[in-house]
Amino acid sequence: MVIEMFNFWYFFWMILQIGATVGLYFAFRKSRPFVQNTVLFSLLVLGLIFHFLKMYIPPYGELVDGQWVITSRGWRDSWFVNVCGANIALFPFIFLTKNKYLKDYMFHIGVLTGLIVLFYPQEPIAKGDAASQMAEFLDILRFYYHHWMIMAVPLLMVLWKRHTLSYKRVWVAPVGILLLMLFIILNQVFQSELGFIPLRNDEALVVPNYKNTSYIWGPLNGDGSMDPIGGIFDIFCPDVFKKLPVSCEGYGLEEGAVKYWPWFWMIVPAFILVTPLAFGLSMIFDGKRFGKDTVYFVRHIKAGGLKDDFKRLGRRIRKAVTEENPNKVAAK
């Protein structure tokens, strides 16, 4: 078995994931809400367990003199250092909440990241030839389960009406992904401080040294070249977030040298790219309400409703000011 773009095994795993999602949908679509919630939560918990158990399979561990030893990569990757890994940790807790904003985030980011991996399974492909992939077959299984789970659970949650999406809450997708990146940064800083990863190399302020799969530290590869996917985000990044604001004498870098501001450089691209994708997903499930709201809004404008709205807003502002400073208003 060797997984390559568009070969038999590429489509095999894709069809298997789609089939599993469709199968679960029909198997439990008429079940009681308690059963549906139990199935979905069990899948999430199983994913969290697998995340830590992966330290006991190659390449995260190896046999040394008859004993299983966790490798340095195993210790590094047991943390939550990319978007999918962080969601594996957070989704079980989000699912238990009744917060509609968090569950909208769970749906949008889960489905979007799951679809990306469904069509571009980068990690298995990067393992190399058939021998290398077979040596790490259990990790390939883990990879596909985790990324299928991240997509399937939120999708089934909405299809089974365990949660109702709203197009008015699409803003939680870009905001949520940016907050998630702060969580990842915190993980990586702790890892670096505790010695699990050398977060920076000798050119510390130029390119990241390890674990930048979520592009938090910039779109550049370790050799300084532009990553193909990161380059898409780079198009929408303001120039101010691509340069050093001051000189850094310790590294011989002058003010204005190329340096992507960690996290900040992703703010504008996240809103420009993620928001329309999340809105598109919302239209699948909330398109009718959007249509009705649009018709109402157009009629409201034609009837002169906006003018009345601004008048009411003005009265509310004056009332609020009056209640806050009654003495000043009386003096006037």
Residue ranges of model-derived segments:
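Membrane-interface capping segments at transmembrane-helix boundaries
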Residues: F28-F34, F279-Y296
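Short, highly charged, low-complexity non-transmembrane loops/tails of multi-pass membrane proteins
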Residues: K288-K328
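Alpha-helical transmembrane segments in multipass membrane proteins, preferentially the mid-helix core
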Residues: A20-F26, I88-P92, M149-V170
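Membrane-interface transmembrane-helix boundary segments in multi-pass integral membrane proteins
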Residues: V2-I15, W171-L179, E193-M283
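A glycine-rich, hydrophobic loop/mini-helix early in the fold
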Residues: N37-P92
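Membrane-proximal helix-loop-helix units in multi-pass membrane proteins
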Residues: I88, I94-V153
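Membrane-interfacial loop-to-transmembrane alpha-helix junctions, especially the N-terminal start
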Residues: P33-L46, Y101-F107, A173
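Aromatic-anchored segments of alpha-helical transmembrane domains
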Residues: L46-Y56, G110-Q122, I177-Q188
